[in-house]
Structures are given as structure tokens and as C-alpha cells.
Amino acid sequence: MACDLTGGRLRPCKDVVGGIRQIHFVNYGDLGTVTVADDQITDASGTFTYYTYDVKGNSSLETNITSSIDNGTTYFEQVVNLTFPKLTKEDNKELKLMAYGRPHVFVETYNGDVMCVGLENGADVTAGTAVTGAAMGDLNGYTLTLTANE
């Protein structure tokens, strides 16, 4: 059966850290034909530009697995939570375009791993705020949530 397990897992070394270093956005569909081998993207035939955002602190990626025994379905909900400090008119414009589209999102961790969110269906902005903050130490910037179901 194609769903049978093929391996186990030993307890890994404690040599990793949490957090996201950078986020890269590619407009939906610009990747062209994507070749995936062994759960890794090995090639993309499209001509594309990626737009990089540096992040630090309150940004994360979480993948939720949803299975239905009754329906025989399984899908993966990928949720990216981002915090961008400092409100700017340039960012207002770009984040509005991001909310209108459904980009592919590449999440680069502090461990050097890069994970793709929304490879097949893109990622939608499902929530966000532009906040000035109330106190001197509060966030003046943006929070954004992108969600992909694959």
C-alpha cells in the first residue's frame, strides 16, 4: 500500500533554534512547472522575481494537519504569521497587493531551511493589522497572516 510507513526517527540533537530569518514572495503562477523530488523543490521552469522581507521576532510558520476518517481526506493548512515594524506608504501599497493576490511564500528559518507555503494553490492573506501602538514601546507596524491549504 502506498501509505505504509517507510522509516522511523531517532531523537535528534539539540542543535536547532526557532524563528524565521526571511520571507520570500513569488507571484502566484510565476514559478512555472515545478519539479519536486523527495519532497524537495529541485527545479522551476518559470521566469520569476522573488521579493524578500527581513523578519525578526514574532514571525512563525505552523502547519496543521486535518484528516477526516469519514471522508477519507487529508490536507495541510500552512499558516504564516508575520510582524513588520514601521508603517510606511510603500509597505501599505505592497501589502495591499499581497492581500489581493495569492503568492507562493518561501519561509527561511534561522537553521537555513527553506519551506514553501502555497506551492500548489498559493497563500491568501487571511488577517492583518496596521497599528500605531499606544505606548512608546508598542509595535508601530504591520501584522499579517497568510494561509495556504495544500
Model-identified regions with their sequence ranges:
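A general structural signal for short secondary-structure junctions and capping/turn motifs
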Residues: 72, 95-97, 107, 134-138
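Compact mixed alphabeta submodule
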Residues: 118-150
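Oligomerization/assembly interface segments of phage tail-like spikes and tubes
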Residues: 68-90, 138-150
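Short alpha-helical segments and helix-capping/turn motifs at coil-helix boundaries
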Residues: 89-92, 130-131
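Short acidic, glycine/tyrosine-flanked loop/strand segments centered on an H-E-D-like triad
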Residues: 79-83, 110-129
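Short, hydrophobic/proline-enriched secondary-structure or compact coil segments at domain edges
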Residues: 20-26, 80-85, 101-110
